[in-house]
UniProtKB/Swiss-Prot annotation:
This is Transcription elongation factor A protein 3. Zn(2+) binds at residues 310, 313, 338, 341. PANTHER family: TRANSCRIPTION ELONGATION FACTOR A PROTEIN 3 (PTHR11477:SF4), TRANSCRIPTION FACTOR S-II ZINC FINGER DOMAIN-CONTAINING PROTEIN (PTHR11477). PROSITE patterns: TFIIS_CENTRAL, TFIIS_N, ZF_TFIIS_1, ZF_TFIIS_2. It comes from Homo sapiens.
Length: 348
């Protein structure tokens, strides 16, 4: 068995341990990884860093967590070490690093090597662009502009790689998630980012002193552990949490979540009725009571008359009752039932 196949096998075992929340035997696997001669290509193709980072986040064994941190630190050093110090490629890499630093949040430092695969994918494109630009410079003066446009397109498309988080749609969250909150699934990472933006819908989240990214990650993890997939049911569940947390007419829900009065596990399972504001609950209750009162109107004991014409069947075979639904000085409400088609209506 080749080294790459062995790493893939270990990564799969670690992911299963995290999914089952049983990390027994993880220490032996991490020791095997520690003795392996790792390369950048193996880190990229096997994505072993993501699996080890998952164990680090979910394992309670201090020895396992410590060894996982050592592995991640060593691999990150390996990923950061190569790079051309001079020339055109060196300048382009420095520009890319400056752009990435501008996107980073001020309150976290990257721990796992999750972003370097994106850099390596950009390197072949950069090489091709530089070679093409050199060859085109000797052939005709018009070609360099075309190559520059192609290079700009490749740079614009680079954020779409699987290793980079999707751009959030909310203007209130402009920074990317910290690597420790990434799941390796682009759909889940996007949902965590949107939940975090919903928790930051108002500046008062700073008063609670909570890490919104961490809280959003916990909410998403509870939803995912319950549904076990990222299908439409999962997305609808996340979407309903976001809309209710961002509702300006229901600020109490978001504040209760930020303060801890509503836990991440509870908000992940609450129904739309449970998340609704007090005003909306009262309105729904009033509508329910009105509907019950209308449908509980007795069919027997009413007065049969031909004074009312049904709007559906146009017949005049009806039964009506008069009930005092409002205050005593208000007129009574007349409830009419068509004996032919069962149509009901009321008027005052």
């Amino acid at each position: 068995m080749g080294q790459e196949e062995e790493l893939l096998r270990i990564a799969k075992k670690l992911e299963k341990m995290v999914a089952r929340k049983n990390t027994e035997g993880a220490l032996d696997l991490l020791k095997k990884l520690h003795s392996c001669q790792m390369s950048i290509q193996l880190l990229q193709t096997t994505r072993i860093g993501v699996a080890v980072n998952g164990v680090r986040k979910h394992c309670s064994d201090k020895e396992v967590v410590s060894l996982a941190k050592v592995l991640i630190k060593n691999w990150k050093r390996l990923l950061d070490s190569p790079g051309p110090p001079k020339g055109e490629k060196g300048e382009e890499r420095e520009k890319a690093k400056k752009k990435e630093k501008g996107l980073e949040c001020s309150d976290w430092k990257p721990e796992a090597g999750l972003s370097p695969p994106r850099k390596k994918r950009e390197d072949p494109k950069t090489r091709r662009d530089s070679v093409d630009s050199k060859s085109s410079a000797s052939s005709s003066p018009k070609r360099p502009s075309v190559e520059r446009s192609n290079s700009s397109k490749s740079k614009a498309e680079s954020p779409k790689t699987p290793s980079s988080p999707l751009t959030p749609t909310f203007a209130s969250s402009m920074c990317l998630l910290a690597p420790c909150y990434l799941t390796g699934d682009s759909v889940r990472d996007k949902c965590v980012e949107m939940l975090s933006a919903a928790l930051k819908a108002d500046d008062d989240y700073k008063d609670y002193g909570v890490n919104c990214d961490k809280m959003a990650s916990e909410i998403e993890d509870h939803i995912y552990q319950e549904l076990k997939s990222t299908d439409m049911k999962y997305r609808n569940r996340v979407r309903s949490r976001i809309s209710n947390l961002k509702d300006p007419r229901n600020p109490g829900l978001r504040r209760n979540v930020l303060s801890g009065a509503i836990s991440a596990g509870l908000i992940a399972k609450m129904t739309a009725e449970e998340m609704a504001s007090d005003e909306l609950r009262e309105l729904r209750n009033a509508m329910t009571q009105e509907a019950i009162r209308e449908h509980q109107m007795a069919k027997t004991g009413g007065t049969t008359t031909d004074l009312f014409q049904c709007s559906k069947c146009k017949k005049k075979n009806c039964t009506y009752n008069q009930v005092q639904t409002r205050s005593a000085d208000e007129p009574m409400t007349t409830f009419v039932l068509c004996n032919e088609c069962g149509n009901r209506w009321k008027f005052c």
